[in-house]
Amino acid sequence: MEEVAWMYEQDPARMKPISETKGEFVSPISEQLLKDIWEYIQDGNNMVGDTLPWESDFRFKPKTLNVWAGINAHGKSVALQQCALHWAVQGKKTAIWSQEMPCETVYANLIRQATAVPKPTEMFHALVAAWLNNWVMVWHQPSMRFEDVFTFLDAAKKENIDHVIIDNLTSIGLTSDNLWMHQRELIVHLKKACMELGLVIHVVHHVRKLDSEKNQPDKFDVVGSGDITNLADNVFIVNRNVEKQEKMADGWGSQTISSSDTRTWSELSDGLKSAVKVRYGQPCRIKLWWNQIGPDTGAFTDGQHAPSTVYFKPPEDMEYDQEVPF
């Protein structure tokens, strides 16, 4: 108590009466909290929360901050947009802000992913857009400052959003005199927003320039302050298989990889999504392939011959002027 009294004398602005704080003891354990604890114990760490679009025990816990990092153009945004569609099917709403893509590009990607059709007809894409209106909202703001991020989050909360995608951290206008300090401050406030607003927040970020684009980055390659990964609940690395892409382009798809590896280049995955930090659970690696329609739809499957996932199915009596995967 003497130490607390001393702190109050030194800096009274930082020491507030209990009545003015938001903190409180949760003891004795309430009936609702007891129920929540029981469900958590029964389900285990991995079974609480929203799933990924691909086969995995990983779950996005409520009120968590997630960082999605990787080399530029390796599929971070593609994977997250596909997640938004997957969550929509689960009855969860997502808000997206993208500095690198205009709104029409984000929606075009979502429509192609949702249908697994590279170029849907005008009627078809209008139906998908109407469905998206209920589940995925895109925030239009050409430039985002520190304080604008939280205006966006507050607006998302008012729209009953469950997941928020911020694409990307580098595009947010932070004061450059001490960029790492301001990045840390932003991550701290994002983590606080997760808890206070009940949101699951996903932040896209870059990794440092590696010796080769074929190298697999890890969490220590994430650009900027180490607190970005330290404070995040989960950190994902999305990496494209550039070597396979080059071999396939050169016509080596049917060739074996080496004398010790008898797989062919075409058998390798097109990409890899690695959970390199998981606060509640175990790290995991998910091999990804472009779906049967190909990269034009910007959607992944978790098996070489896995069927394309169709998130939106139109009326059965609708006519098509092209082949569709359902």
Locate each region found by the language model.
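Cofactor-binding loop segments of dinucleotide-utilizing enzymes, especially the Rossmann-like FAD-
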Residues: 99, 206, 240
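C-terminal regions of RecA-like/P-loop NTPase motor modules
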Residues: 2-42, 53, 129, 146-162, ...
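Hydrophobic/aromatic beta-strand patches that form the interior of the parallel beta-sheet core
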Residues: 66-68, 95-97, 139, 202, ...
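The Walker A/P-loop phosphate-binding site
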Residues: 6, 16-116, 325-326
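Charged helix-capping and loop-helix junction motifs
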Residues: 180-189, 218-222
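Structural recognition of the conserved hydrophobic beta-strand(s) that form the central parallel beta-sheet
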Residues: 96, 165-166, 199-206
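Conserved inter-motif catalytic segment of the P-loop NTP-binding fold
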Residues: 6, 31, 90-178, 185, ...
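Catalytic acidic motif of RecA-like/P-loop NTPases
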Residues: 170, 191, 208
